[in-house]
A protein has these predicted regions:
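Hydrophobic N-terminal alpha-helices or hydrophobic patches in metabolic proteins across all domains
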Residues: 1-280
Length: 280
């Protein structure tokens, strides 16, 4: 029941406490990357360093957790895992960021809020642009993180966030060539989680619209762009249909309802897998 315990405690803590600054953990990751790069930059290419860093971090974290659990006490290894997952998985903070969109005129005041700009990532800090990217951003912050936690543990979720930050944040300075390669890698990494997210949307919303949107989305510009376009098309078409059927409902409430119901669907399936013995 380790998976269930970590997930439950992480979600409870994230729901109870106000948003906690990630500056400390992000600083540690940044310093670790600089040290890692300093050791290998004369040996291998920068692109390979960027690829190997999350892999090396994943191995080191799991090694540390194993040593702590064996030498000290398993409870402390549980705490380390919980801290990492708490840092990675933030559905409630994502919902809070959507709530901030209620005041369209105040969007400019959030441009220096790193937590908001990371979760509501868009090319411009404009209401319509942010809305158009909500569903893809939800996969970055919630669904793909959950998927890699289930597959690889909290360290796997953290490694995914690092790869995501290469593309979607300014923490790491990446040249155009490396970013193009990393987008191809990220496209492969995100493919299954986004397919599962689309399926969850179909289960909790209008199945027919999801199928039509899925079939109409073509893979013409690479897997990374296909993933973004697919989840955006499916989500936005569901929103349009919901608003048309419920003309009095608040637009942002529709977004939040779809995301909340789909995440509950994920949690329900996870519980079934846990009781089925697929996760410890």
């Amino acid at each position: 029941m380790l998976t269930a315990s970590l997930l439950i405690f992480s979600l409870i803590l994230e729901y109870i406490y106000e948003p906690i600054s990630d500056k400390g953990i992000n600083s540690i990751i940044q310093k670790s990357f600089e040290s890692f790069k300093g050791i290998l930059e004369d040996i291998i290419t920068k692109t390979l360093i960027l690829f190997l860093f999350p892999v090396a971090l994943y191995i080191l974290i799991n090694l540390l957790i194993s040593i702590v659990g064996f030498v000290v006490h398993p409870f402390f290894s549980f705490l380390i895992n919980l801290l990492i997952l708490f840092h990675c998985l933030k559905p409630n903070q994502f919902r809070a960021c959507i709530d901030k969109l209620e005041d369209k005129e105040a969007l400019e005041t959030h441009k220096n809020n790193k937590n908001f700009t990371r979760m509501m990532k868009s090319s411009k800090l404009i209401y319509e642009e942010i809305l158009s990217q909500i569903f893809y951003n939800s996969t970055r912050i919630i669904y793909t993180v959950t998927f890699f936690f289930l597959m690889l543990g909290p360290a796997g979720a953290l490694s995914y966030l690092i790869v995501d930050s290469y593309i979607n944040e300014s923490t790491f300075k990446i040249d155009t060539k490396s970013k193009k390669i990393l987008k191809n890698i990220l496209g492969v990494i995100e493919f299954i989680p986004i397919q599962l997210t689309v399926l969850s949307f179909a289960l909790v919303s209008d199945f027919e619209i999801c199928v039509k949107s899925y079939k109409s989305t073509k893979n013409e510009e690479g897997l990374y762009n296909y993933n973004r376009t697919l989840i955006t098309n499916v989500g936005n078409n569901l929103v349009d249909q919901s608003i048309e059927n419920l003309s009095q409902e608040n637009e942002l409430d529709v977004y939040k309802n779809i995301l909340s119901r789909s995440f509950l669907a994920w949690l329900s399936v996870i519980v079934l897998f846990i009781f089925g013995g697929f996760f410890i």
